[in-house]
Design a protein with these regions (language model features):
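SH3/SH3-like beta-barrel fold
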Residues: 17-21
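Beta-propeller and closely related beta-pinwheel folds
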Residues: 26-164
Length: 164
C-alpha cells in the first residue's frame, strides 16, 4: 500500500476529487482508501501550541476541542504516525483525546516538568518522568474544576490559574 499527501482542489462528485499531489503517491493512480487530515477549513485548526520533550504540541480545533496532537520527536511539522515494518516507533507522532466523564474544551497547554493541560472542566498532566512515546503517553486527571480562559502564570515553580 502506498501512502501520500494531496491537496484537494475540487470535488467532482461523491466519489471523485481533483488533487495536487504533495508527496508520496504517483499521478494517475486512483485510490478508494483516503482520509481527511485532522485540520482543515471544515474541522478547524489548532488554537493552542507549545513545545514539550522535543515535540511540537497543538490542541483544540473547532471539531475536536478536546484533542492534543504531538509531532514526531524533533520533526516539528510531521504529525504522521509513520510505521517501520508494521510497528510504531518511539518517535512517532501522538494523538490524544482528553476526555473523562464529559468532554471539555482544552484552554491551555503549559510545559513544565509535566505537560499541564487545563480544560473548561478539569485539569490534566502528561507525566514527564520518562520520555513520552506513543506506548507510554498517559493522561492523568488532577481535579474536576476547570480553568478560565485567562492566561496561567508561574509564581516560582508553581503554575497559578483561575478556576472555572
Amino acid at each position: 500500500m502506498q501512502y501520500g499527501v494531496v491537496e484537494i482542489t475540487s470535488i467532482e462528485n461523491g466519489k471523485t476529487a481533483k488533487v495536487n499531489i504533495l508527496n508520496g503517491i504517483k499521478e494517475g493512480e486512483p485510490s478508494h482508501k483516503w482520509k481527511l487530515g485532522s485540520w482543515n477549513r471544515g474541522s478547524g485548526y489548532p488554537k493552542l501550541c507549545t513545545f514539550y520533550q522535543d515535540r511540537f504540541v497543538v490542541a483544540a480545533t473547532n471539531k475536536k476541542p478536546n484533542y492534543i496532537w504531538m509531532s514526531r520527536t524533533g520533526d516539528y511539522p510531521n504529525f504522521g504516525v509513520e510505521k517501520v515494518e508494521g510497528t510504531i516507533t518511539d518517535d512517532s507522532a501522538i494523538t490524544l483525546p482528553v476526555i473523562n466523564r464529559k468532554m471539555c474544551e482544552i484552554r491551555h497547554l503549559i510545559p513544565a516538568n509535566d505537560l499541564i493541560i487545563l480544560t473548561s472542566g478539569n485539569e490534566w498532566i502528561v507525566s514527564g518522568d520518562k520520555t513520552i512515546t506513543p506506548t507510554n503517553c498517559n493522561l492523568k486527571t488532577q481535579t474536576q474544576r476547570g480553568a478560565l480562559s485567562c492566561e496561567p502564570q508561574f509564581i516560582g515553580n508553581r503554575c497559578v490559574f483561575v478556576q472555572e
